Amino acid sequence: MNILGIETSCDETSAAVLLDGRIGSNVISSQRCHTSFGGVVPELASREHERTIVSIVNSAVTEANITKNELDCIAATAGPGLIGAVMVGLCFAEGMAFALGIPFVPVNHIEAHMFSAFIPESPEHKSPEGPFISLTVSGGHTLLSLVREDLSYDVIGKTLDDAAGEAFDKTGKMLGLAYPAGPVIDRLAASGNPHFHAFPKALTSSSQTSRSYRGNFDFSFSGLKTSVLTWLQKHPAEFIQTHLHDIAASIQYAIVSVLTEKAVAAARYFRTDAISVAGGVSANSALRTAMQEACRHHGIRLYIPGTVYSTDNAAMIASLAGLMLSKGAVRKNNYDVAPFASFAAGAIKASLK
C-alpha cells in the first residue's frame, strides 16, 4: 500500500510517502519567517503552508518514484497544533483524497510522535510492541504514556505548565539566544559544565526511581524559568556572557534530568522493560545520552528515532496511518474530519465512532 502523509501542525510543511511498509520519501520545509519574532506567528505559519504545500507534496511523490494515481491512501495531521496551520494540510489532504477517490486517514500528531521511533526505514525495522513507556517531548507537549500490548495507551503524566521544549526556548531567550533556542543551548552546553549552577528540578525526589514510588509522573518547568530569570538578574551581563556555555549546560542538565528520571521511574513502576522517546526535544544530544545510560543501567530497552524523525515530519504521519489501517482503527472514505487544537488521547479514534 502506498500512503501519502502530510504534516502542517506548526512551522514545518512536510510530505512523505510510505511504499509498501517502507519510507520512500520524506520532504520537510522549515519556516524561517518566525525567527525575528522569537516564536511562531500562527497567521504567518498558515500562509507559509499555503504557499509551499503543493510543491512539497509534488516533491515527495516524485522522490518516491511514483505518480499520484499510484497512491492508495492519504493521511494528514488533524491536530493538535495551530488550528489554521492544521487546516491547511488537513483540507488539502481531504480534497486530494476525494479527487483521487482513495481513503483519507486523519492522524493525531502526538500519537504519530509516540510511534515515530518505529518508523519503517528498512524491511528489518522493529514493529512497536507494548507494553512500553512513551516519553513525548516537544515545544508544545510533554507527556508520559503507558502503551499497552494492543497499542492503546493511557497518559500517566503531563506538564502542569510549560512543555520541556518551551522551557528550552524561553530560558534561551533570557540568555539572548536566537529562536528556536533549544538546539543552540544543546550546542553551547557541549562545552559547558552542567554542575556550574544547580537549577531546580520540580516534582522529582530521590526515591522516584524505586518500584515503590507512589508519587505522580507529571512535569513542571515554570519554576525553572523563574529560577533562571531571577539568577540572571543577579549577575552582570559580562559574567553571563563569560559563563554562557556553563549556564546553558546547567539549564539543559536540569531539564534532561527531570525527563530521564520520570521516564525511568514510570518504566519501573509499571514493570515495563522498554521506553520510547520522541518529539522535537528527543533530538537533544544530552537527553539521548542520559536516556541511553539510564536505560542501560536499569536493563531497559530504549527506542528513539533518528533526529530527522524527532522534529515534525510527515513520515511519522504516513507510518502511523499504515499502522492504523492494519489494525482496522479507521473508517474509509472519511472526508469530513474537523481539526482540533489541543491534545486529547484518542481524539481521532473517538471522532470516527
Curated annotation (Swiss-Prot):
Location in the cell reads: Cytoplasm
Recite the UniProt cofactor note for this protein. Answer: Binds 1 Fe(2+) ion per subunit.
Q: What class of enzyme is it?
A: transferase
Q: Cite the binding residues for substrate.
A: T136, V137, S138, G139, G140, D169, G182, D186, N284
Write out the residues that bind Fe cation. Answer: H109, H113, D312
Q: What reaction does this enzyme carry out catalytically? A: L-threonylcarbamoyladenylate + adenosine(37) in tRNA = N(6)-L-threonylcarbamoyladenosine(37) in tRNA + AMP + H(+)
* Coiled-coil spans in chain: none
Q: Which key words are in the record?
A: Acyltransferase, Cytoplasm, Iron, Metal-binding, Transferase, tRNA processing
Identify which cofactors the protein needs according to its UniProt entry. Answer: Fe(2+)
The answer to whether keyword Hydrolase applies is no
- Report the EC code(s) recorded for this entry: 2.3.1.234
Listed SUPFAM superfamilies: Actin-like ATPase domain
Similarity comment text for this entry: Belongs to the KAE1 / TsaD family.
Per its UniProt record, what PANTHER family does this chain match?
TRNA N6-ADENOSINE THREONYLCARBAMOYLTRANSFERASE, TRNA N6-ADENOSINE THREONYLCARBAMOYLTRANSFERASE, MITOCHONDRIAL
Question: What protein name applies here?
Answer: tRNA N6-adenosine threonylcarbamoyltransferase
What is the native source organism of this protein?
Chlorobium limicola (strain DSM 245 / NBRC 103803 / 6330)
